[in-house]
Amino acid sequence: SNIQTYAKKALLISIMALLFLDVEGNIMFIPEIRWLFHRNDLVIAHAHVAMGISVFFMVISMFINSIKELQKSIYLNSYLFALLGIFIVLSISGFTVAGLLNIPSQNLWILRTIFGCFTFIFISAFIQIGIKHLLLP
């Protein structure tokens, strides 16, 4: 296809989040492994986060060609790093709640907060760029 590199990255993040959402949804129907992942509301939030992210990056992939400021690897790579951090911490939290790992939940909350703040900073930067783009004549 004739899609630019940055749009491909944004679309890849969208597809990865959607696949994660699909896997999480399918786990709900397998009782033998459901207890590993879906033990508390924090872990169930995986799918809701993934759904929002997949739509967000699908939209970014459609408009990234016309917003040149977003065509920097640091935006997409930073957000992908933060997103993967959130998913990994939430997965580890699920294993801890299931009793498979012994990690203090306070440490997991700290990591989750750090990755969440990083994600929020990226979204704020994206909104600022979008506002500046809309205000241009």
Language-model features: locations:
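Non-cytosolic membrane-interface motifs at loop->transmembrane helix junctions
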Residues: 37-44, 104-109
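Hydrophobic cores of alpha-helical transmembrane segments in multi-pass integral membrane proteins
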Residues: 9-28, 45-68, 72-99, 108-134
